[in-house]
């Protein structure tokens, strides 16, 4: 399967990269991108690896999730299967009230 990255997913990853760049420096920020991409490629090979999120909102109902590879395994990638592709929808740190956060625009407080 091929991987498509939605605009919100790209914005989430860029925002997290910028956070690591500011807080921890270039080396850590640059190291963040490899595990994210490796996780996307793993899901392309094994699309059913991530379980469904169990969300009730219609937009999120079919979304699946999977943890980013170590050492960034506090980050969750949300995706869905669509027309033979994996569509990466969001990327964020695991936290409470995920359904609400997933429906917000990237960077919303």
Task: Specify the residue positions occupied by each region the protein language model found.
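Enriched for short, Lys/Arg-rich terminal
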Residues: 69-109
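Arg/Lys-rich, positively charged N-terminal/basic patches that mediate binding to nucleic acids
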Residues: 1-35, 39
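Basic/aromatic recognition patch in beta-strand/loop cores that engages polyanionic ligands
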Residues: 46-86
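Short, hydrophobic secondary-structure boundary micro-motifs
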Residues: 29, 51-55, 100
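Generic structural signal for secondary-structure transition and capping sites
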Residues: 18, 41, 45-49, 71, ...
